[in-house]
């Protein structure tokens, strides 16, 4: 126990010595342990405690809550993008090739430092993405990728705000807040209901946008390994490897989702083809049967009653023919879901008119 306390004291001494004095007394900045505790608590809550509490409960209906939350996140992300951009990246003050950290108390510099802290704070607000999934029992969306992404980010950004608030690494925040504007706009429209689905034609590009973001961050960070720049190499590797890890995770998710969608579409197409073939065979049998009935009527022309009823049978089969044609799409459901359409089942059970006359 004494050894652990000695290690903690030495770590605090190191952080006091090398940490940025401007952020030393800001909320959650004096020590990494509160942030670490919040991240571990988040993982436990969404993977263990939350699903256990919701196991025997009905999913919460959070439509209005989600609309409000996503709207706030869009506004918050837009404000962060503006603050990070106006403090350097979008004004020409920052250099995309190499931007050392400015440790002065210049107003524009302090504006960037404050933007960095608020960006760090935003990583905690994003925990609610997962909390709402758990409350709505959308457990499939609480994936390993999702939990790793949200669970690691606050701790990662904490180190940036503690030691290098500003400079080259804030390019990460600039791109990330832009992507979040797009992402939470999509979530907002989705929460507002089906009538807004027609405006979401671009949703298939969201994962691609995420991957482009990580490639840009990776290239922007790793370029400092090949040029002389007064920026800590440890943070170059930290940010670059984060980008590489998330790039591979998102790419794996993209590929698995794309392949699964492709398989579902192929299965649906095959089901429609089989249903059409079966309907065609059934219709052929119905036409052949009608032909026999009409021939039989010709041989029994004196019996007007029989002729009338037999022709009625042909008409009935004609109706069945149309019904089978219309029902081919519903028959496809049988191959996909295993539920036999009602009208086909009734047609199969119904005796012919000729048998009724006999």
From Swiss-Prot:
- A GO biological-process term: fatty acid elongation, saturated fatty acid
GO cellular component terms?
endoplasmic reticulum membrane
In which compartments does the protein localize? Membrane
- UniProt EC number: 2.3.1.199
Q: Where is the composition biased (Basic residues)?
A: 299-310
Q: Which reaction does it catalyse?
A: a very-long-chain acyl-CoA + malonyl-CoA + H(+) = a very-long-chain 3-oxoacyl-CoA + CO2 + CoA
Q: What is its main location?
A: membrane
Q: Which UniProt keywords apply?
A: Fatty acid biosynthesis, Fatty acid metabolism, Lipid biosynthesis, Lipid metabolism, Membrane, Transferase, Transmembrane, Transmembrane helix
Stretch list, region Disordered:
285-322
The role this protein plays is: Could be implicated in synthesis of very long chain fatty acids.
Question: What is the name of the protein in this document?
Answer: Very long chain fatty acid elongase AAEL008004
Give the species this sequence originates from: Aedes aegypti (Yellowfever mosquito)
């Amino acid at each position: 126990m004494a050894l652990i306390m000695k290690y903690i004291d030495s770590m605090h001494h190191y952080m006091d010595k090398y940490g940025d004095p401007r952020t030393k007394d800001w909320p959650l900045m004096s020590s990494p342990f509160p942030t670490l505790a919040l991240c571990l608590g988040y993982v436990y809550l969404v993977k263990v405690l939350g699903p256990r509490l919701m196991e025997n409960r009905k999913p919460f209906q959070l439509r209005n809550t989600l609309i409000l939350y996503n709207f706030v996140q869009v506004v918050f992300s837009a404000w962060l993008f503006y603050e990070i951009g106006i403090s350097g990246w979008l004004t020409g003050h920052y250099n995309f090739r190499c931007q050392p950290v400015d440790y002065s108390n210049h107003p524009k510099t302090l504006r960037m430092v404050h933007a960095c802290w608020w960006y760090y704070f935003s990583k905690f607000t994003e925990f609610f993405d997962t909390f709402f999934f758990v409350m709505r029992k959308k457990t499939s969306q609480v994936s390993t990728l999702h939990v790793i992404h949200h669970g690691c980010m606050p701790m990662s950004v904490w180190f940036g705000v503690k030691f290098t608030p500003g400079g080259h690494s804030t390019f990460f925040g600039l791109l990330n807040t832009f992507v979040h504007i797009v992402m939470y706009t999509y979530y907002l429209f989705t929460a507002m209901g089906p009538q807004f689905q027609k405006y979401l034609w671009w949703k298939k590009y969201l994962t691609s946008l995420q991957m482009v973001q990580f490639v840009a961050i990776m290239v922007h960070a790793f370029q400092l390994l090949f040029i002389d720049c007064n920026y800590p190499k440890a943070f170059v590797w930290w940010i670059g490897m984060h980008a590489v890890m998330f790039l591979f995770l998102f790419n794996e998710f993209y590929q698995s989702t794309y392949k699964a969608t492709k398989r579902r579409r192929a299965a649906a197409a095959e089901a429609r083809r089989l249903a059409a073939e079966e309907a065609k065979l059934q219709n052929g049998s119905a036409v052949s049967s009608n032909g026999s009935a009409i021939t039989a009527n010709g041989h029994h022309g004196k019996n007007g009653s029989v002729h009338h009823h037999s022709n009625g049978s042909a008409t009935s089969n004609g109706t069945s023919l149309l019904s089978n044609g219309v029902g081919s799409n519903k028959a496809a459901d049988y191959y996909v879901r295993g539920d036999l359409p009602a009208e086909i089942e009734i047609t199969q059970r119904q005796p012919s008119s000729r048998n009724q006359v006999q």
